[in-house]
Amino acid sequence: MSWFTDLAGRAEDFLNLVDQGAATALKTKDGNDLIMDSITDYSGNFEEKQKTTEKYQSQAKSSFISSAADNIKHQKATMLAGTANIKTGTRSSIESSHNSSVNVSSHRSTTQFVRQKKSEPDDEQLFDFLNSSDKVHSSSQKETRKESASVNQAVKPISQSVTMAEDFHNTTEDAGVPLLPELGITEPVVKAETLSDSGSSASLSTTGDPKSHELSNLRLENQLLRNEVQSLNQEMASLIQRSKETQEELNEARTRMEKWNGDNSKNDRTARELRAQVDDLSEAMAAKDSQLAVLKVRLQEADQLLKSRTETLESLQIEKSRILQDQSEGSSIHNQALQTMQERLREAESTLIREQESYKQIQNEFATRLSKIEAERQNLAEAVILAEKKHMEEKRKSDDLQQQLKTSKVGLDSLKQEMADYKQKATRILQSKEKLINSLKEGSGIEGLDSHSASTMELEEMRHERDMQREEIQKLMGQIQQLKAELQDVETQQVSEAESAREQLQDVHEQFATQQRAKQELEAELERQKQEFQYIQEDLYKTKNTLQGRIRDREDEIQKLRNQLTNKALSSSSQTELENRLHQLTETLIQKQTMLENLSTEKNSLVYQLERLEHQLKNVQGSSLNGTSINMSVIESNEGARMRNVPVLFSDSDPNVAGMYGRVRKAATSIDQFSIRLGIFLRRYPIARVFIIIYMALLHLWVMIVLLTYTPEMHHDTPSGK
C-alpha cells in the first residue's frame, strides 16, 4: 500500500498548507494568491491521485474481497474506537469554531495522525485580527468572502473524497464488514475530515456570522456526498455478499464434484465386479462346452462300440446257429474237435510253462552275469589301483637308485681326483729322493760313507712307502670296479623295472580304452533316450498347442455366447434360466476338474516312467563299464525273451495244417512276426518313429483336404434306358 501512504502524505501536506493559508489569509493578499495557487495545484494532483486509487481499487477488488474476511476479527475493535474518536472530534470542531486550532490538534492526536503544529504567533495574530476594528473587518470582508469561497472551492473536492471515505467507513462498520482497515483508509479519512472541519472552522472564524449560510450549504453538500458514499458502500457490501455467495456455490460445487467422484468410483467398482462375474460365467460356459464336446465324443465312441458289439453279436448268433446245425449233423466231429482243442490247449500251457521257466532261467543268468560283471569290474578297479601303487613305488625306487648312482658317480670322481693327486705327489717325492740319492753318490770321503748309509735307510723307507701306496691304489681300484659292477646291476634292474612298468601302463591304457568305448556306447544310448524324451516333450507340446487352439475356439464361442447373453439380458433376463445355466456351468466345471486330475495323474505316471528309465540307464552305465559284448548279448537275450513272451496267434508246430486254413494261419503268423519286429525297430530307433508319425499325419491331412475339397461331377444326361 505504498501508493496510499504517498496519498496520505500528500493530503497531510495539503491540509498543512490550508491551515497556513487560513492563518495568513487576512494579512496579505499576495499570501492568499500563493495559497490559492498551491491549493489549485494540489487539488489537481489530488484528483489525479484519486483516479489512480480508484483504478487500483478496481484492480485489487478481487484480492481485497478474499483478504478482507481474514482481517475482520483482528481490526474490528480498533475500527470502532477510531470511528468513535472521529465522531466526537467532528462534533467538537463544529461547536467550537473559535478554538479551531486546538480542536484540530486534538483530532490529529486521537486519530494518530502526526502533523506539524501551527506556530503560536500565527494563532495570536489570527485572534488579534478577528478582534480588530470594524473598518478593517468591513474593508476586508469582501476579500475574505472571495478568499473563503476560493478556499471552500479548493477544499470541496478534498472534503468530498473525505466524506465519501467516511461514509464508506460508516456503512462498512454498520454492515459488520470492516474493509477499510484492510486498505489503511481509517487514518486518512479521519485526517481529511478533521482537516476539512478545521478548514471550515477557519473560514467561519474569518468570515464570522454572515458565513453561516455558506456553512449550512457546505453541510448539505457534505450530507449529499455522505449519501453517495453510503450508496457506494451498499454496492460494496452487495459485491461482498455476492462474493460470499459465489464462494458458497463454489464449495457446494466442490462437494458435488466429490460426491460425483465417489459415485463414479462406486460405478467403476460395480462394473469391474460385473465384468469379473461375466468372465467367470464365460469360463464356466467354456468348461461346460468342452465337457459337452467330450460327452459327445464319448457318446459317439459308445455308439460305435454298440454297433461293433451288435455286429459281433449278430456274427456270433450266425455262428451259433451254424454250430448248432453242425452239432445236430454230427456230434462226433465236434467231440474230435473238442479233443484236438483240448490237446492244443495243453500243448499251449506246456509251452507257456516252458517259456516261463526259460524266462526265469534267462533272468537268473542275466543276474549272475551282472554279478560277475560287477565283480570283474571291482577286481579290475582294484588291480588298476594296485598297478598304480606299484608303478608309484617303482618310480620312487628308480628315483632313489638314480640319486644313489649320482652320489656314487660323484664319489668315484672324487676318488679318481684324489688318486691322481696322490700319484702326482708320489712322483714328486720319488723324484726328490732320486735327486737326493744322486747328490749323495756324487759325495766323497767319510761323509760319503755316512751319507750312503743314511741314503740307504731313506731309500728303504721310501720303498716301503711306495709298496704301501701301491697296495692302497690296488684297493681303490678294486673298490672302483666293485662300484662299476653295482652301477651296471642297478642300471639293468632299472631298465627291467621300466619295461615292466611300461607293460603295466599299456595294460592299464588298454583297459581304459575299453572302458572309454563302453562309456561312449552308453553315452550314445543315453542320447537315444534323451531324443526319445525330447520327442515325448514335442508330442506333449503339440497336444498342448492343439488344446490351446481348441481353447481359443471355445473362447470365441464364449464371446458369441456372451453377446447372446447380453442381448437376452437387454430383452428379458430371467433368473431361473441364469440359475440353470449356472448349475450346468458348475457341473461342467466339476467334470473339467476331474479331467484335469486325470491328466495330472497321467502326467505324473509318465514322469515316473521317465525317471525309472533314467534310473535304469544309470544302472546300465554303472554295470556295463567294462563288458560291452556281454551287455549286447544280454540285450539280445532280453529281446529274444520279449519275442518269446509276445503271444503268437498260431503255432507253426501243428502237423495237421492243410488247405486254406493253414495258409491263412501262416500269413497271420508272418504278419504278427513282422509287426513285432517293426515295433522293436521303432522302439530302438526313435527317428524312424518320428518319420512314421509325420508321414501318417501328412497322409491324414491330405485325405481330409481331398474329402473336404472334392466336389463330385453332376451329369445331367438322361439315362439311355439300358
Swiss-Prot record:
Q: Which GO terms describe its molecular function?
A: protein homodimerization activity
- Lumenal compartment ranges equal 711-722
Instruction: List, as start-end ranges, the regions of compositional bias called Polar residues.
Output: 149-158
Q: Which InterPro entries has this protein been placed in?
A: Golgin_subfamily_A_member_5
Coiled coil located at which positions?
A: 211-622
Could you tell me which residues belong to the region Disordered?
Answer: 90-158, 194-215
GO BP field: Golgi organization; Golgi vesicle transport; retrograde transport, vesicle recycling within Golgi
Spans traversing the lipid bilayer: 690-710
Task: Give the chief site where it resides.
Answer: Golgi
Residue spans, topological domain Cytoplasmic:
1-689
Q: Which domain of life is it from?
A: Eukaryota
- Keywords assigned by UniProt, alphabetized: Coiled coil, Golgi apparatus, Membrane, Transmembrane, Transmembrane helix
Leader sequence range is none
Kindly list the places in or outside the cell where this protein is found, as annotated in its UniProt entry. Golgi apparatus membrane
Protein name as it appears in the record? Golgin subfamily A member 5
